[in-house]
Amino acid sequence: MNISEAAKLVGLSTKQIRDYEKMGLIKPAVRSLSGYRNYGESDLERLHFIRHSRNVGFSLHQIAQLLALQDNPKRSCREVKVLTAQHIATLNQQIEQLQKMVQKLQHWHDSCQGNDNPECLILNGLNG
């Protein structure tokens, strides 16, 4: 199947697929006589894996690590669990930071009278 069909099937753009190929996340596609990329079932499975990994926030570097583990028949599930635990910790830190941002913005928003007065507590807060 060509790159457009593969992209549509796995929910990625053709550019993403080309980029993943350049990064080595997927093997270079077999080319047709006319030079078009052709993708097989194993390519689609790998692209699905990449998309699912991106959907849960793994970086491309982390995905490369996960793919290397997946490709290694002697892998240890422990290694995968460690990578996942690290990612969960990072996500929890990001959630904490976002919650602090929301609290600060909510405080400014609640303090703002929202009237025609030029004095704005939100802008004052943003000015430090």
UniProtKB/Swiss-Prot annotation:
PROSITE patterns from the entry? HTH_MERR_1, HTH_MERR_2
* Keyword terms, alphabetized: Activator, Cytoplasm, DNA-binding, Transcription, Transcription regulation
Main localization is cytoplasm
Where in or outside the cell it occurs: the entry states:
Cytoplasm
Top-level taxon in the UniProt lineage: Bacteria
GO-annotated cellular components: cytoplasm
Database matches in InterPro entries: CueR, DNA-bd_dom_put_sf, MerR-type_HTH_dom, MerR_fam, Tscrpt_reg_MerR_DNA-bd
Which molecular-function annotation in GO is an example for this chain?
DNA-binding transcription factor activity
Q: Which GO terms describe its biological process?
A: positive regulation of DNA-templated transcription
Q: Which Pfam families match?
A: MerR, MerR-DNA-bind
What range(s) does the HTH merR-type domain occupy?
1-69
Q: Which Gene3D superfamilies does this UniProt record tie to the protein?
A: 1.10.1660.10
Q: DNA-binding region located at which positions?
A: 4-23
Q: What is known of its domains?
A: It contains a N-terminal DNA binding region and a C-terminal metal binding region.
- What is this protein's function per UniProt? Could be a copper-dependent transcriptional activator of the ATPase HI_0290.
Identification of the protein by name: Probable heavy metal-dependent transcriptional regulator HI_0293
Organism annotation: Haemophilus influenzae (strain ATCC 51907 / DSM 11121 / KW20 / Rd)
Its taxonomic placement starts with:
Bacteria, Pseudomonadati, Pseudomonadota, Gammaproteobacteria, Pasteurellales
